[in-house]
UniProtKB/Swiss-Prot annotation:
Name of the protein described by the UniProt record: Venom allergen 5
Organism: Polistes exclamans
Keyword Signal: yes
Protein family membership: Belongs to the CRISP family. Venom allergen 5-like subfamily.
Signal sequence annotation: 1-21
Pfam families membership: CAP
Length: 226
């Protein structure tokens, strides 16, 4: 164990679901009812968070800017053909890489789910009336609080295992799914929820980011080669 370093980390990623609707309780997903319909609009930590000393709910304004800028920095690196890592690398330049903007609705849905303290689990339905929504989750702790950039780097670093020629398959998805959602060319918006809390003398940071339109369709490539 390294003092001041990360003591543990877990990252998970979801394959998308599609649905349409306006009222959250009318939005249908193949695997369950919508998060906001099930838990309501409140972002107050639920009873599942008992035993955790909650320090803050939701990303700060500065963290929101960092989340967007870190995603766009990396997306443009890939789009310009400057990402040398891969299996094999380098990653090809992309012709359809949108810059992401923050979306408060995506962030609210992500925060409602984050505040349920059901760690390492994706919600069953998070779509909006506008589009299907993808999701990345990171969860880390240590003697010092991991910052939001270090969590995003965990997703970014999965590029080392990605073979662009293969695309997304059931076999490789667990290793590369965060990366591919990060650089899904047609995704335009992002919104994230978070919890920072103390437990067993450890400082923990839990981050959920929702993406729209979603990426990570099996059998497809994350972006179009230039």
């Amino acid at each position: 164990m390294e003092i001041g370093g990360l003591v543990y980390l877990v990252i998970v990623v979801a394959i998308i679901h599609s649905s349409q609707g306006v009222d959250y309780c009318k939005i249908r997903c193949p695997s369950g009812i919508h998060t906001v319909c099930q838990y309501g609009e409140s972002t107050k930590p639920s009873k599942n968070c008992a035993g955790k000393v909650i320090k803050s709910v939701g990303p700060t304004e500065e963290e929101k800017k960092l989340i967007v800028s870190e995603h766009n920095r990396f997306r443009q690196k890939v789009a310009q053909g400057l990402e040398t890592r891969g299996n094999p690398g380098p990653q090809p330049a992309a012709s359809d890489m949108n810059d992401l903007v923050w979306n408060d609705e995506l962030a609210h849905i992500a925060q409602v789910w984050a505040s349920q303290c059901q760690f390492l689990v994706h919600d069953k339905c998070r779509n909006t009336a506008k589009y299907p929504v993808g999701q990345n989750i990171a969860y880390a702790g240590g003697s010092k609080l991991p910052d939001v950039v270090s969590l995003i780097k965990l997703w970014e670093n999965e590029v080392k295992d990605f073979n662009y020629n293969t695309g997304i398959t059931k076999q490789n998805f667990a290793k590369i799914g965060h990366y591919t959602q990060m650089v899904w060319g047609k995704t335009k918006e992002i919104g994230c929820g978070s919890l920072k809390y103390m437990e067993n003398k450890m400082q923990n940071h839990y981050l959920i980011c929702n993406y729209g339109p979603a990426g990570n369709y099996l059998g497809q490539l994350p972006n179009t080669k230039k």
